[in-house]
């Protein structure tokens, strides 16, 4: 389910004849923005979900710490601070986490900005006991957009091509082995645009072509 409905007033769909690959894309004019849809996806997804108030944490181990010990210390810190992990990835010994603000202790302000700022301070305090400052990167004010659909090898490529065509940068990607769900971490400022793009390109355009 979508957690917000983009404006639909004055929508129009037209083939881009000036594009030599016009058979592979269309431009959807919606109010003051143009949405580019690549060719219809293999299967229309079932739902799109957005989760806001996310902080991305990138951790780089010190050279003297073995990978297995670094992993253990990271998860011990997460358990101690009772932080919910929404996404997790590793690359060359580095760890990237997407943490939800819902794991914070009670009494946090209702302000979205205040929640993220408080989480950043609390998290930094916990991580500083684990790593030097220059080994920790925090990216607050992020969101996770998840696309749930039927299994298809082409679904991931179609989604990322759609995001790239509409200049929606991703910070983190998760794709389950069953190919039923794809999740991307994006900046909160892109959530409304991403929902609008996905509704137009993954639902409407796929269903009508």
UniProtKB/Swiss-Prot annotation:
InterPro entries found in the cross-reference section: ACT-like_dom_sf
Composition bias, Polar residues: 12-27
A GO biological process held by the record: lysine biosynthetic process via diaminopimelate
Biased composition (Basic and acidic residues): 1-11
Family annotation (SUPFAM superfamilies): ACT-like (SSF55021)
One of the record's GO molecular function terms: aspartate kinase activity
UniProt keyword terms in alphabetical order: Alkaloid metabolism
Transcription is among the record's keywords: no
The keyword RNA-binding is annotated on this UniProt entry: no
GO cellular component, one term: cytosol
Superkingdom of the organism of origin: Eukaryota
Induction: Expression is induced in loline alkaloid-producing cultures as well as in planta.
Pathways per UniProt: Alkaloid biosynthesis
Summary of the protein's practical applications: Loline alkaloids show broad-spectrum anti-insect activity, and different lolines may have different biological activities. In vitro tests of NFL, NAL, NML, and semisynthetic loline derivatives with long carbon-chain acylations on the 1-amine have shown that many are effective against both fall armyworm larvae and European corn borer larvae, but the effects seem to differ depending on the modifications. N-Formylloline reduces the weight gain of fall armyworms by deterring feeding, and does not significantly affect corn borers.
Region Disordered, annotated ranges: 1-27
Family: Belongs to the aspartokinase family.
Known role: Aspartokinase-like protein; part of the gene cluster that mediates the biosynthesis of loline alkaloids, potent insecticidal agents composed of a pyrrolizidine ring system and an uncommon ether bridge linking carbons 2 and 7. Lolines are structurally differentiated by the various modifications of the L-amino group and include norloline, loline, N-methylloline, N-acetylloline, N-acetylnorloline, and N-formylloline.
Name of protein: Aspartate kinase-like protein lolA1
């Amino acid at each position: 389910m979508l957690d917000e409905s983009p404006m639909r007033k004055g929508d129009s769909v037209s083939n881009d004849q000036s594009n030599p690959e016009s058979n592979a894309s269309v431009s959807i004019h919606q109010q003051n923005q143009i949405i580019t849809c690549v060719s219809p996806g293999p299967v229309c997804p079932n739902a799109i979900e957005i989760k806001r108030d996310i902080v991305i944490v990138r951790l780089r181990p010190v050279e003297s710490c073995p990978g297995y010990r670094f992993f253990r210390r990271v998860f011990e810190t997460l358990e101690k601070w009772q932080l919910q992990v929404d996404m997790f990835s590793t690359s060359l010994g580095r760890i990237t986490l997407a943490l939800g603000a819902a794991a914070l202790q009670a009494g946090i302000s209702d302000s979205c900005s205040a929640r993220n700022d408080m989480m950043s301070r609390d998290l930094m305090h916990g991580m500083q006991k684990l790593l030097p400052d220059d080994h920790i990167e925090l990216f607050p004010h992020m969101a996770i957009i998840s696309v749930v659909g039927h299994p298809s090898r082409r679904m991931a490529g179609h989604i990322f091509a759609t995001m790239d065509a509409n200049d929606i940068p991703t910070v983190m990607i998760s794709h389950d082995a069953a190919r039923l769900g794809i999740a991307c971490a994006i900046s909160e400022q892109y959530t409304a645009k991403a929902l609008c793009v996905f509704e137009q390109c993954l639902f409407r355009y796929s269903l009508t072509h």
